[in-house]
Design a protein with these regions (language model features):
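A short, surface-exposed helix-loop junction/capping segment
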Residues: 1-9, 59-62, 98, 132-135, ...
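A short beta-strand motif that forms the metal-chelation/ATP-contact edge
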Residues: 42-54, 174-184, 290-308
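C-terminal active-site "lid" helix and adjoining low-complexity regulatory extension at the edge
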Residues: 243-266, 272-279, 286-334
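Active-site nucleotide/adenylate-binding loops and adjacent lid/helix of ATP-dependent enzymes
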Residues: 59-60, 69-217, 262
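A short glycine-rich, hydrophobically flanked beta-strand micro-motif that places a catalytic Asp/Glu
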Residues: 36, 162-166, 173, 277-290
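Residue-level "edge-of-site" marker
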Residues: 37-39, 96, 132, 285
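ATP-binding N-terminal substructure of ATP-dependent carboxylate-amine bond-forming enzymes
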Residues: 1-81, 103-105
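Extended, charge-rich helix/loop segments that form flexible
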Residues: 203-252
Length: 334
């Protein structure tokens, strides 16, 4: 059955990877069994000799990655330390906790009260994100101490800690690796608003905020210059929302290789190897400051979404990824 047929009729909440797993099972002759009343949140994949269970949400769809490697990658600060030790250029940064709970187990210098001093060391401008966040939630530029305070107030409702990093500007790419081999690379682009000739940028942002909220993703209206808010976009005109480029937050991707692809791919490979990941999506900057050879890893994803491949009609790459997973846990022979 084509992947598009499996997608048809699924509820919007049904996990993408559950659909892809069923598609791969049909292709490779394995048994797929959904075990949560049709939600797709839990399922098993079985061969003639064994069965393996998978779960959505915080569950991993990449069993070839060890729990140690995957959880290390999920902590953006610790992952950065490990990569830096291996000689991988990263964005650096420091972490700060937002609540008093568990303070007895933490080293000094990383509480909310300490964030202001570090922020000033960065020139009172930084890129902020939750320490263990995903999908671009609360990932944004903070440009003043007042904005930092407001940001920490809001993010503390949902997360325990944040990472503050110096600002870098460049072209952003995602490199997807399986056992060190590049499966694909794609350039990431920021989200855009499309004018209707009637609505102001502020009004279009309100609609965007509402759509993001339904998916549990923060908005970034504070990152928009107030001078633009009342401007009415002509019909069809596109206006870039500054900041994050995650597809889940309205960004886009297209297949592309960096200008210095060999160097970029080598950087991604060193990052994955440093963390011990067999499957990983490495997000990196190239062309930093206009220098095409300047590159740094942004972060490493051990449980990345692959919806981009479905939307691009690359069912073959989805199957390659799931075959790699099935082989790694003994459901298929090499």
């Amino acid at each position: 059955m084509p992947l598009s047929d499996l997608r048809t009729g699924r509820q919007p909440f049904y996990p993408d990877q559950s659909i892809y797993a069923e598609f791969a099972c049909q292709t490779f002759g394995l048994d797929f069994a959904e075990i949560d009343g049709g939600t797709g949140l839990a399922f098993t994949v079985s061969s003639a000799t064994r069965s393996v269970a998978f779960g959505a949400g915080r569950g991993s769809f990449f069993p070839q990655n060890s729990a140690t490697a995957a959880t290390l990658a999920n902590d953006k600060y610790l992952a950065g330390l490990v990569m830096q030790r291996a000689g991988v250029a990263t964005l650096g940064g420091q972490y700060f906790f937002l609540h008093e709970r568990y303070r007895a187990y933490r080293p000094p210098g990383h509480e909310r009260a300490d964030a202001g001093a570090y922020f000033r060391d960065l020139g009172s401008s930084a890129f902020a994100k939750p320490l263990a966040g995903s999908r671009g939630d609360f990932a944004q530029v903070v440009g003043s101490e007042a904005a930092l305070g407001a940001y920490l107030d809001e993010v503390s409702k949902y997360y325990d800690a944040v990472l503050l990093q110096p600002l870098f500007a460049g072209r952003e790419y995602r490199v997807f690796l399986l056992d060190g081999e590049v499966l694909f690379s794609a350039q990431k682009m920021p989200p855009v608003l499309v004018g209707d000739g009637l609505s102001s940028i502020g009004e279009l942002l309100v609609a965007d905020v509402a759509a993001l909220g339904l998916r549990g993703i923060s908005s970034v209206p504070s990152a928009v210059d107030e001078r633009w808010i009342d401007r009415v976009l002509p019909a069809g005109e596109r206006w870039t929302i500054p900041g994050r480029m995650n597809r889940s937050a309205g960004g886009s991707m297209h297949f592309a290789e960096p200008d210095h692809a060999e160097a970029a791919f080598a950087l991604a490979q060193r990052a994955a190897a440093a963390l011990g990941l067999r499957a990983a999506a490495i997000d990196l900057f190239t062309d930093i400051g206009g220098d095409p050879t300047a590159m740094r890893v942004i972060e490493v994803n051990a449980n990345p979404s692959i919806r981009f491949l479905e939307d691009s009609g690359r069912d073959d790459l989805i199957l390659k990824i799931w075959r790699h997973s099935f082989v790694s846990i003994g459901l298929l022979d090499v």
